[in-house]
């Protein structure tokens, strides 16, 4: 998961609001996942979610749609209304040869999603 407009937010509003967007993104992602799923900030404006016990692609798509919706509402911070969005790349562990390969597949899908449309997800296949 990678922000679509984080640099623009930092440039327009400053780093304190950018930091708040990162915190709010983490909170919203965690609130949009199940208790046994793992949400982590990898670096900068990039996050990862490890979903356990997902057996159907349709369920995965439903989860991704919920994640997209979680940031539909803007962040209200002091006197600022900040719209933010992200793109999601999806990869399946059983289709990867290693954890690094899994992340590379998810990154590949995420960057494809970024080129197609902001606020979108792509499944690596």
Per-range role (PLM):
Residues 1:
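Active-site flanking residues adjacent to catalytic metal/cofactor-binding acidic residues
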Residues 4-34, 40-44, 48-49, 55-65, ...:
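Conserved long alpha-helical elements within nucleotide-processing catalytic cores of c-di-GMP signaling
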Residues 13, 82, 89-91, 118-121:
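Flexible, nucleotide-binding loop/lid elements of kinase catalytic cores
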Residues 41-42, 71-86, 114:
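Catalytic core regions of nucleotide second-messenger enzymes
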Residues 50-60, 78-81, 86-102:
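Catalytic strand-loop-helix junctions within cyclic-nucleotide turnover domains
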Residues 68:
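Short alpha-helical N-box/ATP-lid segment at the N-terminus of the HATPase_c
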Residues 72, 104-124:
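Catalytic/regulatory signature loops of cyclic-dinucleotide turnover enzymes
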């Amino acid at each position: 998961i990678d922000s679509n407009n984080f640099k623009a937010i930092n440039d327009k509003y400053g780093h304190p609001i950018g930091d708040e967007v990162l915190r709010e993104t983490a909170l919203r992602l965690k609130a949009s996942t199940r208790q046994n799923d793992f949400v982590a900030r990898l670096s900068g404006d990039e996050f990862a979610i490890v979903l356990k016990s997902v057996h159907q692609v349709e369920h995965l798509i439903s989860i991704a749609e919920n994640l997209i919706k979680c940031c539909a509402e803007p962040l209200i911070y002091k006197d600022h209304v900040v719209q933010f969005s992200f793109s999601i790349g999806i990869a399946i562990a059983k289709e990867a040869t290693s954890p690094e390969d899994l992340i590379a597949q998810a990154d590949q899908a995420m960057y494809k999603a970024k080129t197609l449309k902001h606020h979108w997800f792509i499944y690596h296949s």
